[in-house]
Amino acid sequence: MMLGLENKLKLYGFNNLTKTLSFNIYDVCYAKSEREQKDYIAYIDEQYNSERLTNILCDVTEMIGAHVLNISKQDYDPQGASVTILISEETLAVKEIDKSCNLGQIDILKTRDTIVGHLDKSHVTVHTYPEYHPDNSIATFRVDIDVSTCGEVSPVNALNYLIGSFDSDIITIDYRVRGFTRDIDGKKLFIDHKITSIQDYIDENTLKKYDAVDINVYQSNIFHTKMLIKEIELQNYLFNRDVYEIKPKQRLEIENNLRKEMIEIFSGTNIY
């Protein structure tokens, strides 16, 4: 489902609603030795460096119909990356844009050690969090993306693209609408589009791969969806190892440990 411009509400003045999408994905991997765990973290760090994350966020900006004003990005030592993009709902004349904004020009970005993106009213940010523990054979990787917009632009239109951009075993999505605008008669509007569930904006083929749970507070315009991958294809969770090198009994044990890790992350509770 897309939030289109058809059947537009007739508003008085500017649309003052703020729509914020918080999107977290978790990728889980089996890495038995400390060497494998460190290699996995290094691999993830390279796969999702600030340059690739910048490209993803620029695509998101285009999908929601916004325009890049400024980009800031940074890779961290020993691992992790961050990107922030400031966006505007409509194209602005060059003379209207603050001189500190780089408009996402790559040649400018190459001359800076740190890059941040800005919108006139809105922003898009991403941070990565690789993680492992030497006493645990499982390593994880979290991507935290926030898209906040004002006006007619809604970030939920980019959900399918975001899910497809990462290897997602667990997904948590929060969407909220704040503020109010007015119609032409002066009546307050606390939301300007219909929504009953975040799942309404996720492709059916994607939903079939996950168990999904909603927790919504409609009177507060708060929507929350959690998703857990249904099937574990073990080969996809092994780092630099072939599944056939592992004995069947150990395969089952690894699958059980992966599933337990996913369930705890999904529930936000130490269960096992």
From Swiss-Prot:
HAMAP family: AdoMetDC_2. It is an enzyme of class 4 (lyase). Pathway: Amine and polyamine biosynthesis; S-adenosylmethioninamine biosynthesis; S-adenosylmethioninamine from S-adenosyl-L-methionine: step 1/1. Its cofactor is pyruvate. Binds 1 pyruvoyl group covalently per subunit. GO terms for molecular function: adenosylmethionine decarboxylase activity. The keyword S-adenosyl-L-methionine applies. This is S-adenosylmethionine decarboxylase proenzyme. Is synthesized initially as an inactive proenzyme. Formation of the active enzyme involves a self-maturation process in which the active site pyruvoyl group is generated from an internal serine residue via an autocatalytic post-translational modification. Two non-identical subunits are generated from the proenzyme in this reaction, and the pyruvate is formed at the N-terminus of the alpha chain, which is derived from the carboxyl end of the proenzyme. Catalyzes the decarboxylation of S-adenosylmethionine to S-adenosylmethioninamine (dcAdoMet), the propylamine donor required for the synthesis of the polyamines spermine and spermidine from the diamine putrescine. Keywords: Autocatalytic cleavage, Decarboxylase, Lyase, Polyamine biosynthesis, Pyruvate, S-adenosyl-L-methionine, Schiff base, Spermidine biosynthesis, Zymogen. The modification Pyruvic acid (Ser) is found at residue 122. Gene3D superfamilies: S-adenosylmethionine decarboxylase.
